[in-house]
């Protein structure tokens, strides 16, 4: 990630936010890869519109796509490096452009993940809740297993017997 961090604004911000909020960098990076990983790197202009990933070529295009989704009545739109959900978190940003700004997007995601960790006391539960609310156990389990797989694939962790059993592998 160090080499890629210099070229990818999301990855550089992940390193800064991990240090700022005392989050293991590998966990924050694996969450980002799970959210917007495309060809092995995080995407600052990524969106998820109604469950469909979209990789815009620019912030301007991403804004246009998000605005069109609003006009079309799409309720769930996730934006940026860490796929911040506009419906549930958009009021924490001054604009769509701010939500897509890698520094603001990653900082908010890291702060949110740290709050979840303080509430649930484990990184596994914090990661689970990052993706899905408390009443969606199947989605949480799938998500945590995808994050663990990315953590292992990037060299930040390894499969433990408990993780293998939990994820069914």
Regions found by a protein language model. Give the residues of each.
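Catalytic glycan-binding domains that act on GlcNAc-containing polysaccharides
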Residues: 3-169
């Amino acid at each position: 990630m160090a080499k890629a961090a210099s070229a990818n604004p999301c990855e550089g911000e992940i390193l800064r936010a991990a240090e700022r909020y005392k989050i293991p960098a590998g966990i924050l990076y694996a969450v980002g890869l799970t959210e917007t990983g495309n060809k092995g790197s995080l995407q600052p202009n990524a969106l998820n519109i109604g469950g469909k990933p979209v990789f815009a070529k620019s912030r301007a295009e991403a804004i246009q796509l998000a605005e069109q989704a609003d006009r079309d009545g799409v309720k769930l739109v996730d934006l940026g490096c860490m796929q911040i959900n506009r419906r549930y978190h958009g009021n924490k940003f001054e604009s769509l452009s701010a939500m897509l700004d890698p520094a603001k997007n990653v900082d908010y995601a890291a702060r949110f993940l740290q709050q979840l960790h303080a509430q649930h006391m484990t990184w596994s539960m914090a990661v689970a809740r990052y993706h899905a609310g408390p009443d969606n156990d199947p989605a949480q389990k799938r998500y945590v297993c995808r994050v663990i797989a990315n953590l292992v694939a990037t060299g930040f962790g390894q499969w433990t017997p408990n993780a293998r059993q939990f994820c069914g592998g």
